[in-house]
Amino acid sequence: VQTAGYSLTEQQPLNNIVRVAYQAMAGVLGGCQSLHTDSMDETLGLPTESAVRVALRTQQIIAHETGVHRTVDPLAGSYYVESLTDQMESDANILIDEIDGLGGVVQGIHKGYFRRSIAEASYRFGQEMEAGDRIVVGVNAYRAGNEDAQVDLLQIPHSVETIQCERLETFLKSRDDDKAMLAL
């Protein structure tokens, strides 16, 4: 399970720590086998070392301080969780039927189904935010403090980009294009 990077915001990035923590806890409560927690500053660029450490500490706190590991299925029997699961299953079956109707996943890709679906969902999300139907703390509500820089950004020297471009150029010149095309 990976926490939902799309839910992170550029505004008030420290709030992303809370977003990542509750998403991680939800994954653990749902019985995930492995967990990746996004860093609070990933919407701004590559994560800083301190942000990565906070993401790691989030996992460690959940693992060692919450007691969640003491039971196999802590949400078993919850009517609310069962109703959410039933709704998710119903929604998933509708999507599966749509994709099957297109001729399968590959045809869906060729027909632009997935890109279109993601774009439409993103548009709806934005419309809901603008209308105030969906509150995103720090973005369309509780915005005081947005003018303050809250986190440092990772600064990568220009020389690193130059070196990587040179390495790529050398690689591209030395590779066998026929073998590359065959491999693809």
Locations of the language-model features?
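Glycine-rich, charged/polar anion/phosphate-binding loops
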Residues: 19-23, 123-125
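Core alpha/beta catalytic barrel or barrel-like domain that forms the active/cofactor pocket
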Residues: 1-10, 25-44, 61-82
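Active-site cavity-forming subdomains of large catalytic enzyme subunits
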Residues: 10, 15-21
